[in-house]
Amino acid sequence: MSFFYDGCHNEARLSVIAGPCIFESKEHALDMAGALKEICTSLDVNFIYKTSFDKANRTSSLSYRGVGFDEAYYGMNAVREVLGVEVLTDVHEAWQCGSVAADILQIPAFLCRQTDLLKAAAETGKPVNVKKGQFLSPKEMVNIVAKLESFGCNKVMQTERGTTFGYNNLVVDMRSLELMRANTPANYPVIMDCTHAVQSPGGYGTSSGGDRDMVPAIARAAVAVGVAGVFMEVHQDPDNAPCDGPNMLHLAKFRPVLEKLLEIDYVVKKGV
């Protein structure tokens, strides 16, 4: 059971998925989750902490992958037990689905068509957040959702994270948010990933670049369209983060950005 998922609806007050790109240490996870929880609680925002135990989808073997499954497991579980904060994490192989310390499983964009992975995630009974592949049209997501449903999952989230636009670049078509919602009669929550959307895949050769200054603009546009929630990777020192620093939002900017998004969300949803 996920209280976050139960409170995340397209017509409800904006929900937030936030946290650093990757799990760095138990202490760092508790610090980040605690800071984000404090902000979201003060603003009455439905919040779940995101982190990754392995960055397996990387072009270069020189890219940082993480501390490993076991260490991340105990640290992620500490966030849940010590802080009472739910956790969302991505899975890359079927065996991981039943083993991770997470309340919501996330299917990476590059793996959104992997049937065995979707099946394993669905069979856990946990909500599944599937990211739309950078190579997929929003209308094709109906097939991904149907596949999850066929394996017994009726708690699905769909996340937009941009579409490949030439080399080392992504573009966001805001129409996709409406199309993904319209495609699914169950009205599953639609989420906007505001930080990976400003990524420059492979932009630094052996790692990705990005433009974090564009995160607030992408977020405001998505909330103006109307979404269930936003996904934002946040770090207290993104310039020195192990990975994805160029597109992570600085923790110091998280609250003011979120306050503006809530103002827009209120207008769009007429005071929900």
Where on the chain are the PLM-derived regions?
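Catalytic beta/alpha-barrel core
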Residues: V67-G68, V82-C97, D103-D116, K126-P138, ...
